Amino acid sequence: FIIGDVFALRENEDTYNVGWHFNKRFEGKGFACEAAAGLLDYLFREAGARRIYGFVEDDNIRSKRLCERLGMRREGCFKEFVTFVNNPDGSPKYEDTCVYAILEKEWNTIRQW
């Protein structure tokens, strides 16, 4: 089974955009938090990240909670920012998208392990 995946895109030398996809069958078991925390820790400790951010659709409650559990702050929400799906008539369905972010110094404060 594939539980999910986490990924990071390097925006510049010290800034990364992160994201994840997880199989709904494994929700609520802590896998997403463990995997995402591992990714953030790697980026801050090994890859030289200073800032990490991610985009989350406003109605994706689980991903928003995950960002908050990771210590990321909500920095804003873009109205009708992006679309990944279509409406029933085939037209693009634009979704409100929030930005969550965390700095290395914040991560070091909350992740003392």
What spans do the regions from the language model cover?
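Acyl-donor (CoA/ACP) binding surface of acyl/acetyltransferases
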Residues: 1-113
